Amino acid sequence: MSKTISVEITINASLDEVWNEVSKIENHSNWMKDAEKIYFQTDKKSGVGTKIKVLTKIGPIKLNDFMTFTKWENKKAIGVDHVGLVTGVGEMQFHEISEKKTKFKWIETLNFPIYLGGPIGEYFGKPILEFIWKQNLNNLKEIFEK
C-alpha cells in the first residue's frame, strides 16, 4: 500500500524564474525545511540520471532519502524515484498561467518501511507530509514574493 500526496501553489513569478530556482537541486534545502542537507551521488547536478542523498528530518525522525532523477523536461516537469528506506515516485510540475504567474504542483507516492509503521505510518504520515510540503511551497513562493 502507498499514499499519494499532492500539493500545489500559484507563484507570482514567471515560469522561467520558478524553473531556474527549482531546477537547481542544491537550492532545495533553502525552501524545503525537511531537507536538511543534499549530497550529490553523481558528478551530474541536474537532469535524468542525477542521484542525490537527502538528510531528511521530520519531527524527531531523521533519515537519508536516496533519489534518482528519472524525468527532466525543461520548464515542465522533474521526476524522481525514491530508492532508499522510503520508496516511491515523485514529480514536480510547472504550468505557466500568465507571463508573471506559475502554478507549481508537487506529487509524491510513497511507501513507508515497516519500522516507520508501514501502511499505518503512511496513513498517519500523509496529513503531516501534506502540511510540511504546503509550508515548503509557501517558502518557495516567498523567495519570489518578498
Predicted regions: what they are:
Residues 39-86, 99, 115, 135-146:
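Glycine-rich portal/gate segments that line the openings of hydrophobic small-molecule binding cavities
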Residues 15, 35, 51, 76-77, ...:
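Structural motif
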Residues 18-22, 28, 52-54, 69, ...:
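Hydrophobic pocket/interface hotspot
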Residues 1-10, 101, 134, 138, ...:
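Hydrophobic-ligand-binding modules of eukaryotic lipid transfer/binding families
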